[in-house]
């Protein structure tokens, strides 16, 4: 553990951020899996609705820096293509 006061504070802050980010990342993956499950089941309406729910979450995570903005764009583009192919 750190000896300097500011380093101790940073360690505590880092741990809080890590847990917060893990929670957000898990939520994002859950939304993503719902879309994939609907696509694999061949349910276009459910896939479209799940995608509409997932899109703002993905954008928010990209804005907050949890994922890169290009990754968010790439995931949205690929899922849109899969939904259109149904």
Curated annotation (Swiss-Prot):
Q: Care to name a GO molecular-function term for this sequence?
A: structural constituent of ribosome
Which GO terms of type biological process are on file? translation
GO cellular component terms, A-Z? cytosol; small ribosomal subunit
| This protein's UniProt keywords | Ribonucleoprotein, Ribosomal protein, RNA-binding, rRNA-binding
Region Disordered, annotated ranges = 1-26
Q: Which domain of life is it from?
A: Bacteria
Q: Which family does it belong to?
A: Belongs to the bacterial ribosomal protein bS20 family.
Q: Describe the function of this protein.
A: Binds directly to 16S ribosomal RNA.
Put simply, this protein is called Small ribosomal subunit protein bS20
Gene designation per UniProt: rpsT
